[in-house]
Amino acid sequence: MKGYVVCVYKGISSEEKLKEYAIKARSAVEKYKGKFLIRGGKTTTNEGSKSPRTVVIEFPSYDDANSFYNSREYKEAHKILMSHAERHHQTIEGS
């Protein structure tokens, strides 16, 4: 079954750091054969709090998605954004 990384941002304090993070994270996504399904875009908040950004990445498997998140490459990218964004981050197994 496919694996998905879902990231719902609650707040972003630096668009510049977000761009820097995105460039570095992209190479880790590609290394683990991830495919971006959603990166920002137009949204309608139907329930709950409005989010400034949502990202969904599909991986060949749940294990690949977890390997991506726990990889050295992604951890380096994550450090760039840590104090510049608040977000909810999950790895989900598809059906």
Residue ranges and their predicted role:
Residues 1-53, 60-66, 70, 93-95:
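Short S/T/G/P-rich N-terminal loop/turn motif that feeds into the first structured element of a domain
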Residues 62-90:
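C-terminal structural segments of small proteins and small subunits
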